[in-house]
Each structure stands twice: as structure tokens, then as C-alpha cells.
Swiss-Prot record:
Ca(2+) 1 binds at D289, D291, D293, Q295, E300. It is found in: Vacuole membrane. This is Two pore potassium channel a. GO terms for cellular component: plant-type vacuole membrane; plasma membrane; potassium ion-transporting ATPase complex. It comes from Oryza sativa subsp. japonica.
Length: 347
């Protein structure tokens, strides 16, 4: 792209754009295009700036019903399949239907205790197919259901603090976005502790394992290590295991994912702090001067800072400028409703 097109797109040479003190009319025009109107004619804001959680988070809620349906179908098909070949699966039995469901869950979560194992080629191939499908279902379940549960807790937490957030809905959303990862991590860590405690106590009291063996079995299960020397052997134990294994392995996977996400976010914040606090140099000014007029306007400065933060790259900037030139039908260096009308009619 030549210098003239860049100059037109950044509007550095247009005296009507990026003035230091834009007129009140311009301010109102820009605000009404980017934020909700504060014009008195539009009516006063709602009393107390009440925020309805259902409306505020309508688009944020993940659609997990399909994932839940896939999980149900997987377990149903798995129970029917393994029930049909249960005679070809060796190990300690309790109930044919329960054992089929238990084996399906152990296979899906890749725990693999070894207390029930396929002993012919047909059941081995069936187990191979179900373990791959099960991992895909678990991955979808992790990304949908866990996020939904944590965001429900965020809504309740911020509704309690709503009276202290005078900025209203916008400020509330900003606060949630800033602390989202931390809340997910802390909530997930608490759920992980509760899962470990509940599994250990159950194995200790119901399966009659020692306290150390119970904790050992829990750790081998939630990490999907599954040595197989300790497992759920009673009928009640396998009923508990069907639900506990699914939830605990999902929680464990989420825990390490959020831990890595917190580390990544911290690195990003350190970079952002360095970019925003360091002093500009002459070399920085030269790099930010996109139109080579020896002056850096507000638009150029913002673009340069975004590039430093890694939020935008040169290819994206070029594509935005190309889009601007296509919309600027009259080549005035600015966009107006008239330009948009002409651009739409030309398509």
C-alpha cells in the first residue's frame, strides 16, 4: 500500500479529525455509535442500575445441552454394546448392566483400572473405538459444562457486590472479564479438593480400604493413571464410581488448564505493563509515524502501542486500511452515511 493511502486512512493530514478538543457535537456523534445513549430524551436509566443476570449473560452462557446429549448417547450406546459382550470381558462382576456402565465410564475417562478387561479381539476393538470417542466427548464436556458452572458463580458473586460498582453494567462486565480466569481457577481448585476428599472417604468407609490406599486410589483415578491394584469392587462402589470418576477427571483437567491460563495471563500483563509504562524514544516515534510526516497522531500512537502489545499485526492493519478505502467511495479521507450508502449500492 502506498503512502498516500496510508495517509488518507490514518487521517493525519485532515484538520477535522483527531483534533485535541473535538466539538461537543462530534463527541456526541461518536458516543452514540459506540456506547448506549445518555441523552435525556431517551429516558432516565433504570433505578439503581439493576443488572439482570439472565439478560447480561445471555450470550456468555455456553450451549452445553448438545454436549450433555452426546454424553448421554455415548453412555447409552456404550452400555448396550458392552452389555452384549459382557461374557467376553473378564474380571470381578457385580451386576451386568452396572458393570457395562462402569466399564464404559472407565474406558471413556482413560482411567483403565484393569479390574474389567476385554479378553477377545472383538471386545478389544470395541474398547479401542469407545476410548477415542470418549476422549472427544470429555473434551467437549470440559469446555462447555465447567465454564457454565463457574460463570454461574461469577454472576452470584458480582450481584452481591453490585451496589459497590457505580459504573453499572459496563463496569460489571469489565470487572468480570478482568478476573474471570482467577475465579475459574479458585472455584475449580475448591471443587478438586472436595472431589479428592469425597472419593477418599467413600473408599475408606464403603470399600474398606485403608486411608492411605483410599487416597492412593483417588490420585490414580483423577490423574487417569489407573494402576489397577486398587479400585471400586462393590455394587454400591461402582454406582458411586460412575458419577465420581466422570466429574473428578473433568475437574482435574480443568484445574491444570486454568493454571496454565493464569501463568499466560500474568506474562501478558507484564508485557502490557512494560509497554504502557516505558518512555517513548525517537526510534519509537519514527516507527509509529506511518505516514512519514514527522508527526505522530493519536491514531498512529494507538496503533503502534497495539502492535507492541501483540494485539494487532501489520497484516491486520493493512486489511483494515483496504476495507476503509473501499468504504470511502468519495475519497474524502472520512466515512459518512453517504459513503456507506454508495458502497452498499455498488455491491
Amino acid at each position: 500500500m502506498d503512502d498516500n493511502s496510508i495517509q488518507q486512512s490514518l487521517l493525519a493530514d485532515n484538520p477535522n479529525v483527531l483534533q485535541r478538543k473535538p466539538s461537543e457535537g462530534v463527541n456526541r456523534f461518536r458516543r452514540c455509535r459506540s456506547t448506549p445513549s445518555t441523552d435525556p430524551l431517551q429516558g432516565p436509566p433504570e433505578k439503581g442500575s439493576s443488572v439482570k443476570a439472565k439478560e447480561l449473560f445471555k450470550e456468555m452462557r455456553p450451549s452445553f445441552r448438545l454436549v450433555g446429549l452426546l454424553l448421554f448417547i455415548y453412555l447409552l450406546v456404550g452400555v448396550l454394546a458392552f452389555y452384549a459382550v459382557m461374557d467376553e470381558i473378564s474380571g470381578k462382576r457385580t451386576n451386568r448392566v452396572l458393570d457395562a456402565l462402569y466399564f464404559c465410564v472407565v474406558t471413556m475417562t482413560t482411567v483403565g483400572y484393569g479390574d474389567l478387561v476385554p479378553n477377545n479381539d472383538t471386545t478389544k476393538l470395541l474398547a479401542c473405538a469407545f476410548v477415542f470417542m470418549g476422549m472427544a466427548v470429555v473434551a467437549l464436556f470440559v469446555s462447555k459444562v465447567a465454564d457454565y458452572l463457574v460463570e454461574k458463580q461469577e454472576v452470584l458473586f458480582f450481584k452481591a457486590l453490585h451496589t459497590n460498582l457505580k459504573g453499572g453494567e459496563t463496569k460489571m462486565l469489565r470487572a468480570i472479564e478482568t478476573n474471570r480466569i482467577k475465579y475459574k481457577f479458585y472455584t475449580n481448585a475448591l471443587l478438586l479438593v472436595l472431589s479428592i476428599i469425597s472419593g477418599t472417604v467413600f473408599l475408606w468407609k464403603v470399600e474398606k480400604l485403608s486411608l492411605v490406599d483410599s487416597f492412593y486410589c483417588v490420585c490414580a483415578t483423577i490423574t487417569t493413571l489407573g494402576y489397577g491394584d486398587k479400585s471400586f469392587s462393590s455394587k454400591l462402589g461402582r454406582v458411586f464410581a460412575v458419577f465420581w470418576i466422570i466429574t473428578s477427571t473433568i475437574i482435574m483437567a480443568q484445574f491444570f488448564m486454568y493454571l496454565a491460563e493464569i501463568y499466560t495471563e500474568r506474562r501478558q500483563k507484564m508485557l502490557a505493563n512494560w509497554v504502557l509504562t516505558r518512555k517513548m524514544t525517537k526510534m519509537d516515534l519514527e516507527a509509529a509515524d506511518l505516514d512519514d510526516d514527522r508527526q505522530v497522531g493519536a491514531a498512529e500512537f494507538v496503533v503502534y502501542k497495539l502492535k507492541e502489545l501483540g494485539k494487532i499485526n501489520q497484516e491486520e492493519i493493512s486489511s483494515f486500511l483496504e476495507e476503509f478505502e473501499k468504504l470511502d467511495v468519495d475519497h474524502s479521507g472520512t466515512l459518512s452515511p453517504y459513503d456507506l450508502t454508495l458502497a452498499q449500492s455498488a455491491q
